[in-house]
Amino acid sequence: MTNERKEELQRQCSKFRNDLIDLLHSIQTGHPGGSLSCTEILTSLYFEIMHVNPENPEMEGRDHLILSKGHAAPMLYLVLAEKGFFPKEELKTLRQIDSMLQGHPCVHKTPGVELSTGPLGLGLSAGLGMAMADRIKGLDSYTYVVMGDGEIEEGCIWEAAMSASKFGADHLIGILDNNGVQLDGTLEEIM
């Protein structure tokens, strides 16, 4: 990656952060910390790494992203809107009853969302299933799972990690958002 491209992505991250604060302030609800801490992760994936097509979100052979830490959905929505999955005007409907943008990602409502998430710890298992299914189909796509550091205390995360190793799921990429904070305090205080 060139320095110019890196600076461009950094500017985009700054814009996403500002937009997130404005968005959550306007609706007076949301999880700003979890969304802010995954800004670089989601920006890098969607604007530099992943093979996706906003005009055809169900495209065969696309890469997949699972936001296992579903409470960070507002940042995902900002990124998806900027990428062109849906009009930016939809962001104003965040967390409204009939909105396509619920408090947690919903695969049935939001273009570009691959899995409905909310309960922590389930994303890596689902991602393993997606990666294995793509391998069986002969596809060269990748599945990226963004997890929070608090959720890796869940046993099912480690079962999925062991299974991924056993079955050689080399197209499954787990990404840990290590921000050091859980809902009730710091990681050191909770665990």
PLM segments and residue spans:
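Charged helix-capping and loop-helix junction motifs
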Residues: 157-159, 188-191
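N-terminal hydrophobic or amphipathic helices/low-complexity stretches enriched
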Residues: 1-16
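Hydrophobic alpha-helical scaffolding
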Residues: 6, 10, 66-69, 187-190
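Short, contiguous strand/loop micro-motifs
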Residues: 7, 29, 63, 78, ...
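Cofactor-binding active-site loop characterized by glycine-rich and histidine/acidic residues
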Residues: 20-23, 35-166
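Structural motif
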Residues: 28-36
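A short, conserved beta-to-alpha structural element at the edge of catalytic cores
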Residues: 166-190
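N-terminal capping segment at the start of a domain
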Residues: 13-29, 177-178
